[in-house]
Amino acid sequence: MLTTFLNNLMMAMTMVTMTAPAQPQMTTVATAIDSNPNKASKDASDPRAYLNEIDGDKAMTWVEAHNLSTVDKLSKDPRYSEYQADALTILQATDRIASPSFARNGMIDNFWQDGTHVQGLWRRTTWESYRSGNPQWRTILDVDALSKAEGKTWVFEGADCLPPTSNLCLIRLSDGGKDADVVREFDIAKGEFVKEGFVLPEGKQSVTWVDENTIYVTREWTLGEVTSSGYAYVTKVVKRGQSLDQAVEIFRGQKKDVSAERGVLRDIDGKYVMDTSYRGLDFFNTELAFYPNGHTDTRKVVLPLPTTAVFSSYYKGQAIYWLKSDWTSAKGTVFHNGAIIAFDLKAALADPARVEPLVLFMPNEHQSVAGTTQTKNRLVLSILSNVTSEVRSFDFGKGGWSSFKLALPENSTLSLTSSDDESDQLFVFSEGFLEPSTLFCADAATGQVEKITSTPERFDAGGLQAQQFWATSKDGTKVPYFLVARKDVKLDGTNPTILYAYGGFQIPMQPSYSAVLGKLWLEKGGAYALANIRGGGEFGPKWHDAGLKTNRQRVYDDFQAVAQDLIAKKVTSTPHLGIMGGSNGGLLMGVQMIQRPDLWNAVVIQVPLLDMVNFTRMSAGASWQGEYGSPDDPVEGAFLRSISPYHNVKAGVAYPEPFFETSTKDDRVGPVHARKMAALFEDMGLPFYYYENIEGGHAAAANLQEHARRYALEYTYMFQKLMDNK
């Protein structure tokens, strides 16, 4: 399939080139144009408006022409085919760890993709077979066979199985990787879709089991009945055998919400506890309500907690919340942001005003909570301390709360992969930049830890080392970053270096073993830096909040400070420094390219936001106003315009030649940001690379082959920009 695709690209190149309109002479310095949004009035016509039509003929002609041009240029480099082959070998390796997930009755599930199973297999084995090292798998669903039979490129998005047996599952399938999906009922015991079972057509929707014959469905029931973010806010009850037009409304949020839905709270055994409802007021504020008297209860109870508090677990009758802001209880007790708190849920619902939690964990200034999970009898927390991990197991009994630390590897990234609700076992991955992923099975009750398997080394890390450094940002804040380079690295400013970061939505960036990065870059003499800038979750809510809305320049200052520290240490210099980031990190890259074009020689901008004046009217952009602010607010809007990459390309300025990457089927951020930014560069005579995967959603790839092609394009570009000039 991949070879055919590339051959078609090459065959079509001549025809596209012949029909493409004449373009401005490309230089590294932007030329002045009347349609530059930096100068054009708000009411001026937009010559790039046709690119707003995702699948429009004119837009797709533009996309295809630039795809062809980019692939043609980069694939002529002999390294391209080498990188693609190496990446595909790594991604499709049959000796990689089959990531496990606990299923019922001592079974282990896995979703597997390789060269034969491009779209993947959902499969199952016994725990004994899995730990043997040579598991015998039974296929539950062959997504490739289903795709072929139905003429689709189905991407498996997961399954919600009805407890306690978990035989009936609601499977979510996305056409090409979009956020919108279809839902179908599947019987695992029979290995087939349920005849005349529950089926939901494509949409951005959520679905919850109530019982074997009832589901709650939140979707766009009436055309246009979605929030400004494009998500549903009306939940209806659907009974087995009913058509969707027979569904009965049970809950309605508000159109101004980000999203809203009615759901079900269950205990660890899968037993029904009560109904809940959720309203996303913005990305970080929610109204969570409980209905203590069951499905027919119309009396909702909202606890007097901050709307930023996150409901994490229901454990032994205790509600576990993660505080994202300070809160004072009715008794006057101050609970600080970042804390994990617990209280008796049913008692709190009976008398909400008297909620008085206990603190399970309060991070210090160097710590944050990375996640929580639950086994049959234990509550488990993953904790970051200076961006390295530890895992603690908590118990609640007659004597109150107690906890201990699990004996897992120190100074590594620990990921809670899956926990068992029928025992106290959980799977934990441990990894580092130079340490391949190792899978452990831990018993959260006894503390026993067993190594199950490890990923083979995919690149030569013998001469490499990973170190943590701290840069000083513009306002004096110390910002950590990791540097992976050769132990004997010459500090002469010529080391080709990729700097990566995200810096948003309280998402921490941690060390991880990237075999592709190691094989295609580190092994060949490149250095890699990972910046833990503000906006992320490395040090809890305060670290994130410091970069919200009109404070976002701090995020960009942090990134620049890390770059300047690398240059000051003579690790690298502008001719050899490239940057890369995706989604919110794509916005970060766009801002860096515009604000400090003198610092970088290569910029990879993946699935980005770039038009911050209009982002709320593009795809799901309205849902991120809690992070970025509102363009319609006078103060926030003025700031957003000042940092919007699309509105700050200036004539007479020399910019590095960027590489824009996006996906036609990305219905979260959407491809329009990247399209219009690239088109603006084109109109201003600036060179660039552009690649828009026709499938793949916000991940920009729908299968392993597409990921391999993307890696080959990116690293060929990086080598040309950063290594070929040594």
Residue positions per predicted region:
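Mature N-terminal segment immediately following signal peptide/propeptide cleavage
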Residues: 24-76, 84-85
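Non-catalytic accessory segments flanking enzyme active sites
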Residues: 57-161, 172, 259-292, 296-324, ...
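Beta-propeller blade signature
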Residues: 123-126, 184-189, 231-241, 287-294, ...
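Asp-box/WD-like beta-propeller blade repeats and closely related beta-sheet repeat scaffolds
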Residues: 136-158, 169-173, 178-214, 218-226, ...
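Blade-edge beta-strand/turn elements of extracellular beta-propeller
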Residues: 137, 188-200, 242-254, 291-303, ...
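Cap/lid segment of the alpha/beta-hydrolase catalytic domain
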Residues: 144-165, 173-180, 189-192, 196-197, ...
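Polar, glycine-rich mid-to-C-terminal structural blocks
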Residues: 232-279
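Active-site-proximal cap/loop segments of hydrolase catalytic domains
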Residues: 517, 523-524, 530-726
